[in-house]
Curated annotation (Swiss-Prot):
Broadest EC class assigned to this enzyme: transferase
SUPFAM superfamilies in alphabetical order: Lumazine synthase
Coiled coil (residue ranges): none
Any single Pfam family the record assigns to this protein: DMRL_synthase
Family designation: Belongs to the DMRL synthase family.
Any Gene Ontology CC annotation: riboflavin synthase complex
Protein name: 6,7-dimethyl-8-ribityllumazine synthase
Length: 154
């Protein structure tokens, strides 16, 4: 039996962070966390690109274009959708996640979903460097691990 598992060793691969501008205070903290996490694991600033889009709805489109470009080994998608008084929140959060999954399955480029879908702004703050950590950091680590794993898989 062969066992395959990625790790956090530095790679020469390029990474891209695609982040929404909507709820900027939260998404900026997620982007900072992702960049610091990659840098802390040996990925140079010149190997990290950041793409900003208006909102979470636009993230899958940008991810698809980037994945098809073939220059990045992994995509880190970051955003924040906070429930409001209408069902719009559900449509945006669900279809964003579905779109990101579709991009990675169709292109073979790992797409890490760090788009927060939360009830309240306090929930987002807790996940953007607060009591629940930083989901940007977590997605960056998962991206690095997946890039290394993809190199190992037959």
């Amino acid at each position: 039996m062969t066992h395959y598992e990625g790790d956090l060793r530095p790679t020469t691969a390029r990474f891209v962070i695609i982040a929404s501008r909507w709820n900027a205070r939260i998404t900026d903290a997620l982007v900072t966390g992702a960049r610091q996490s990659l840098a802390g694991n040996g990925i140079g600033e010149d190997a990290i690109d950041v793409v900003r889009v208006p909102g979470a709805w636009e993230i899958p489109m940008a991810a698809n274009r980037v994945a098809q470009g073939g220059q990045h080994a992994a995509i880190i998608a970051l955003g924040c959708v906070i429930r409001g008084d209408t069902r719009h929140y559900e449509h945006v959060a669900d279809l964003c996640a579905e779109g990101l999954m579709s991009v990675q399955l169709q292109t073979g480029v790992p797409v890490l979903n760090g788009v927060l879908a939360v009830e309240r702004v306090e929930d987002a703050e807790a996940r953007a460097g607060g009591s629940h950590g930083n989901k940007g950091e977590e997605c960056a680590l998962a991206a690095l691990e997946l890039v290394n794993l993809m190199e190992l898989l037959p």
